[in-house]
Amino acid sequence: MTSHSSFTQRLRRALAPVLLAASLLPAGSAHAEGKLRIAEQYGVVYLLLNVAQDQHLIEKQGKARGVDIQVEWTRLSGGANVNDALLSGAIDVAGAGVAPLLTVWDRTHGRQNVKGVASLGSFPYLLVSNNPAVRTLADFTDKDRIALPAVTVSVQARILQLAVAKQWGDKEFNRLDRLTQALPHPDAAAAVIAGKTEITSHFASPPFQDQELALNRNAHVVLNSYDVLGGPSSATVLYATEKFRAENPRTYAAFVAALAEAAAFTRANPEAAADAYLRINKGGIDRALLVKTIKDPQVHFTVVPQNTFTLAQFLYRIGAIKHQPRSWRDYFFDDAATANGS
């Protein structure tokens, strides 16, 4: 045996473990598994993510599956911004309302195939006004401005359109759109509480709606999303591309397991969950009010999607999405954790 052939064999033996490890990685994502970039927004509707972050549940579930997960957290405002971040590759998992999920599912149908990963729970969204003259949708005038996270595409915007369509017919679904204005929840809540700006109403989410009702004596509820949707429904969901799910199976599974663990923790320990929220969000709300919000019997902490199809049918009916979903399963990934959804 020549020295050259001997060296070649030694080199092959030395490289064999490296080549084997590389062959086991998903194609095109040698560095992807174990990295997770999550975009959330504002409010208690993201509590499960706050608990998962505070308790390091994603990292814990990753270790149980043999992968060290590095989690990056980003906070954005509005479903449109979240969707742009997802499609640009800036994030791996998006957190937003059901309406932005349906928008991006429709937009990527047959391409990136974005679908829902899990729900973050069912919460009532309240349309709150500080204008004593506004008690119903019919009472809004051109002097009123309704703040919401994103005009047209946010879940609040779509629920408002659905409520308008129920009152005046589908052809009039955008009747109040001219009164809406995009504003992050914290800023909108501050405006409604102060009562000194053009923002007289806010289609909010907890805890901001609770703060408004508690801190401005003129603030009152004009509309409850549960009434519009026919019962409790998932307020906020998480979604990702088909590619990310396929190329990062252990990271994805760990993430879903961490969410389920966070939901169980929150149901069993609402006050500890409130403390986690306060730590992650650096305060910003009275603890007693926050605990009251978390314990609200209308609130359900679960990763299982609930009553999302009503909005999906409406968006197809008015032409907001081009692809008609036959059931909620069309726009959610098929996972055991969410199998009993709707």
Language model region names:
Residues 28-32:
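Sec/Tat signal peptide C-region and signal peptidase I cleavage site
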Residues 169, 175-177, 181, 186-279:
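Pocket-lining segment of extracytoplasmic ligand-binding domains
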Residues 59-68, 226-230, 296-305:
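Short, solvent-exposed loop/beta-turn-alpha elements that line the ligand-binding surface or hinge
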Residues 246-322:
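Secondary-structure end/capping motifs
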Residues 2-18:
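Bacterial N-terminal signal peptides that target proteins for export
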Residues 19-27:
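Hydrophobic core
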Residues 34-173, 178-182, 200-206, 231-232:
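Short, glycine-/small- and polar/acidic-enriched structural segments
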Residues 315-342:
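Conserved C-terminal helix/tail region of periplasmic/extracytoplasmic solute-binding proteins
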